[in-house]
């Protein structure tokens, strides 16, 4: 996607010096800090948090 400032238009991977292209834990081409909520709890659920090393939002390990 050449319209994405984080994306190398040839490889569609993060540009040099950038961490990520997109994802719930990616903002302005960088990973969000560990502990940033990426999915708010619903009902009996628990919040999910960014790890600081990935653009993905991992499932809370304490969920049933």
Curated annotation (Swiss-Prot):
Disulfide bonds join 6-29, 20-26, 25-50, 38-57. Keywords: Cell adhesion impairing toxin, Disulfide bond, Hemostasis impairing toxin, Platelet aggregation inhibiting toxin, Secreted, Toxin. GO terms for molecular function: toxin activity. It is found in: Secreted. It comes from the Eukaryota. A motif (Cell attachment site) lies at residues 42-44. Expressed by the venom gland. The keyword Transmembrane helix does not apply. Residues 1-64 form the Disintegrin domain. Its main location: secreted. GO terms for cellular component: extracellular region. SUPFAM superfamilies: Blood coagulation inhibitor (disintegrin) (SSF57552). InterPro entries: Disintegrin_CS, Disintegrin_dom, Disintegrin_dom_sf. Pfam families: Disintegrin. Heterodimer with VB7B; disulfide-linked. Negative results: does not inhibit alpha-1/beta-1 (ITGA1/ITGB1), alpha-2/beta-1 (ITGA2/ITGB1) and alpha-6/beta-1 (ITGA6/ITGB1). PANTHER family: ADAM A DISINTEGRIN AND METALLOPROTEASE DOMAIN, ADAM METALLOPROTEASE. Poor inhibitor of platelet aggregation. The disintegrin inhibits the adhesion of cells expressing the RGD-dependent integrin alpha-5/beta-1 (ITGA5/ITGB1) to immobilized fibronectin. Inhibition on alpha-2b/beta-3 (ITGA2B/ITGB3) is low. Belongs to the disintegrin family. Dimeric disintegrin subfamily. This is Disintegrin VB7A. It comes from Vipera berus berus.
